A protein has these predicted regions:
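N-terminal amphipathic/basic-hydrophobic helices that include classical n-h-c signal peptides
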Residues: 1-23
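Glycine-rich beta-alpha loop segments
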Residues: 28-36, 40-182
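Solvent-exposed alpha-helices and their adjacent loops that cap or buttress functional pockets
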Residues: 90-93, 148-150, 173, 193-195, ...
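Short, solvent-exposed amphipathic alpha-helical segments in soluble enzyme
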Residues: 115-116, 173-174, 236-241, 267-271, ...
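Residue-level recognition of the N-termini of beta-strands and the immediately preceding loop/turn
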Residues: 152-155, 248-250, 279-282
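Phosphate/pyrophosphate-binding betaalpha-module
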Residues: 157-224, 228-229, 235
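Short, acidic/small-residue loops that bind anionic groups at enzyme active sites
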Residues: 176-189, 224, 238-262, 277
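C-terminal functional extensions of proteins
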Residues: 253-307
Length: 307
């Protein structure tokens, strides 16, 4: 029925922005008259079982695991992995992060080097426990800064696993701050470390999408001693910054001695495969305080804290 002004009249007792049960159709409260997919998913579970309805072809596409895992659906799965984490972080109003990369095999002080295959590795890994302590302390410093923004800025993010990753999440938990864990399915059994905030604990199939999420909100990246995974993450970040596919942000390597043993950066510049000025993309730190000061200076956080 139209009103005198030509508009459609609302039926008495109804709200255009709410369903009959009083709940908004969408989280933002906007009206959506289309039936939602979760309702149909529930309805489809109780339909009469017949040869036709029992066929896999009859299963709703978006709840058909076998269909979603088909090779042809890889682009869809890539999009889903990107969207799920992005939507949750947006809903939590996570605006920026501090990324912590580092070895899963580095034990906490006093713990045995579980990954060591011989006495030399055992000694080296247990000596490397100093980086666990520094990572934990660094995460505390980041999280103290994050508190001033109600934990929307400078939120610690790690790979969610053991070693340096655990130390990062643990440091945030020490000061009552949330932290993010971006875990990935690996051939051996792995669970997220117990210090990741449960609502910010994510799991990935695709390394590429996982690395995108590490960098999409990053205000700084720290790289502690680690193995192939840490090197992969480091080179991804430094390449994006060097090629200007990513804004310059502090890229901080912990332990100059370790990294110079592993990679001869100066040799790359001398050989001409990188420019001498590319070396300026790298910062080195020995302690959590040194690393945090690099970030504070870059973003002028000391001035913000001044009375």
């Amino acid at each position: 029925m139209k009103t005198a002004s030509g508009g459609l009249a609302r039926r008495k007792g109804t709200s255009m922005a709410r369903l009959k049960n009083g709940k908004h159709r969408r989280k933002d409260g906007s009206w959506d008259p289309l039936k939602d997919s979760s309702t149909d998913r529930q309805t489809a579970q109780v339909i009469p079982r017949t040869p036709q309805s029992a066929s896999s072809s009859y299963t709703l596409a978006y709840v058909d695991d076998e269909f979603l895992c088909r090779e042809e659906l890889r682009p869809v799965r890539l999009q889903l992995e990107l969207l799920k984490t992005e939507m949750i972080l947006t809903e939590r109003n996570i605006k920026s992060t501090v990324v912590m990369f580092g070895g899963a095999r580095i034990p906490a002080p006093g713990q045995e080097a579980w990954a060591a295959k011989n006495d030399i590795q055992k000694k080296n890994l247990e000596n490397a426990s100093i980086y666990y302590d520094q990572a934990r302390r660094f995460a505390q410093l980041c999280s103290n800064q994050s508190k001033s923004s109600d934990y929307h800025e400078y939120v610690v993010v790690t790979g969610g696993g053991p070693g340096v990753m655990e130390a990062g999440n643990r440091g945030a938990a020490d000061v009552g701050a949330p932290s993010i864990g971006l875990n990935i399915v690996l051939p051996h059994e792995q669970a997220p470390n117990p210090y990741v905030t449960p609502e910010l604990s994510f799991n990935f199939h695709y390394f590429a999408i996982r690395k995108m999420h590490f960098l999409m909100r990053a205000k700084a990246i720290t790289i502690f001693p680690g193995g192939f995974g840490t090197l992969d993450e480091f080179f991804e970040a430094v390449t994006l910054i060097q090629t200007k596919r990513m804004a310059p942000i502090p890229l901080i390597l912990f332990s100059k001695a370790f990294w110079h043993d592993i990679i001869n950066f100066e040799a790359l510049a001398n050989f001409g495969t990188i420019a001498p000025e590319d070396l300026q993309l790298l910062h080195f730190a020995e302690t959590a305080e040194e690393a945090w000061q690099i970030i504070a200076d870059f973003y002028d956080l000391n001035a913000e804290a001044a009375p």
